[in-house]
């Protein structure tokens, strides 16, 4: 029986005090990118969600170097997901003995990094990738405007 070499490491951040939608806005920008490119993107983005995600990226890279002995140049973010966590509920005291509820949302962030030097499938897919660009047509068809009698006839 052949044992497959482990090529993925992950870092999990739970109960991060932030909305899941705000964290997803940043995660969608870094999914599928290399380690160095991700660090540059996160350091330049102006969102508050970048700092906890940056800490998770550092943690996943440290896990990869410690557990697999891989270098940071070979790491690619293969999976990044944000799930909603528990909602912290508090009461804010108001006038006349009343209180208003405050709901503080949390989220769970999972970062999975893959070492591309150990992964054979990634190397094969990278070599099969087409490098040609498709030429887009810049001419816009106006047949709908001409067939309908134009836009100026209607009041």
From Swiss-Prot:
It is found in: Plastid, Chloroplast. The keyword RNA-binding applies. PROSITE patterns: RIBOSOMAL_L22 (PS00464). It holds the Pfam family Ribosomal_L22. GO terms for biological process: translation. GO terms for cellular component: chloroplast; large ribosomal subunit. GO terms for molecular function: rRNA binding; structural constituent of ribosome. Keywords: Chloroplast, Plastid, Ribonucleoprotein, Ribosomal protein, RNA-binding, rRNA-binding. This protein binds specifically to 23S rRNA. Part of the 50S ribosomal subunit. Belongs to the universal ribosomal protein uL22 family. This is Large ribosomal subunit protein uL22c. The lineage of its organism: Eukaryota, Viridiplantae, Streptophyta, Embryophyta, Tracheophyta.
